[in-house]
């Protein structure tokens, strides 16, 4: 049966899509690179314009190539564990505040494998922090090794939709995302129960209308 079209696929839906794979199975693959990325998030009581709840801070970043993605990078699993490699990448991209943040196997959420344009497994982690920790990461990110080079800056994901029904998350999803980071973001919204499925579908439809 042919798959139905979905608004979040965009123009690239005809390209081979990554498939889900278990962490254990992925580590048995030969000839594949491994990349680990993490969503750092924290609850927030703030309100935009004193009326629109922020609810939760989710961090993404603007990359050197002009695309949005999550912090992290490639890990050589021959030398270190996925989590050790991710920790190193986070410190390089986000700075000294990450020295006290431990990302463990308990924070692991999913893995996907793709064959094109290169054989690669992407591993996704979700780590909850305190708002004060997120704010410290944001403040100290300018001192990171990769700031201004591989990382152009940190970005908070707007979880709300404004009265015009396109401002906020629908407009945010119109950005250019690297690899499967957009699907990882949508996965996180579902996994953390930040939006109901009907709300996610409405956001995707609004975002699709903005693009087309």
UniProtKB/Swiss-Prot annotation:
UniProt region (Disordered), positions on chain: 1-23
Binding residues annotated for Mn(2+) 4, in chain numbering: 150
Entry keywords, A to Z: Cytoplasm, Hydrolase, Magnesium, Manganese, Metal-binding, Nucleotide metabolism, Nucleotide-binding, Nucleus, RNA-binding
Residue span, Nudix hydrolase domain: 39-187
Note on cofactor: Binds 3 or 4 divalent metal cations. Acts specifically on U8 snoRNA with magnesium as cofactor. Has broad substrate specificity with bound manganese or cobalt (in vitro).
One GO biological process term: positive regulation of cell cycle process
Record's keyword annotation contains Cytoplasm: yes
Residues that, per the record, bind Mn(2+) 2: 89
Keyword RNA-binding in annotation: yes
UniProt tissue specificity: Detected in ovary, and at very low levels in epithelial cells (at protein level).
Residues bound to Mn(2+) 3: 89, 93, 150
GO terms assigned for molecular function: 5'-(N(7)-methylguanosine 5'-triphospho)-[mRNA] hydrolase activity; cobalt ion binding; dIDP phosphatase activity; dITP diphosphatase activity; IDP phosphatase activity; magnesium ion binding; manganese ion binding; metalloexopeptidase activity
Recorded catalytic activity of this chain's protein: a 5'-end (N(7)-methyl 5'-triphosphoguanosine)-ribonucleoside in mRNA + H2O = N(7)-methyl-GDP + a 5'-end phospho-ribonucleoside in mRNA + 2 H(+); IDP + H2O = IMP + phosphate + H(+); dIDP + H2O = dIMP + phosphate + H(+); a 5'-end NAD(+)-phospho-ribonucleoside in mRNA + H2O = a 5'-end phospho-ribonucleoside in mRNA + NAD(+) + H(+)
Activity dependence on pH, as recorded: Optimum pH is 8.5-9.
Short sequence motif Nudix box: positions: 74-95
Residues engaged in binding Mn(2+) 1: 72, 93
Pfam short name (any one): Nudt16-like
Enzyme class: hydrolase
UniProt: substrate binding residues: 37, 63, 70, 180, 184
InterPro entries: NUDIX_hydrolase-like_dom_sf, NUDIX_hydrolase_dom, NudT16
Compartmental location: Nucleus; Nucleus, Nucleolus; Nucleus, Nucleoplasm; Cytoplasm
Family: Belongs to the Nudix hydrolase family. NUDT16 subfamily.
UniProt protein name: U8 snoRNA-decapping enzyme
Organism: Xenopus laevis
Gene name of this polypeptide: nudt16
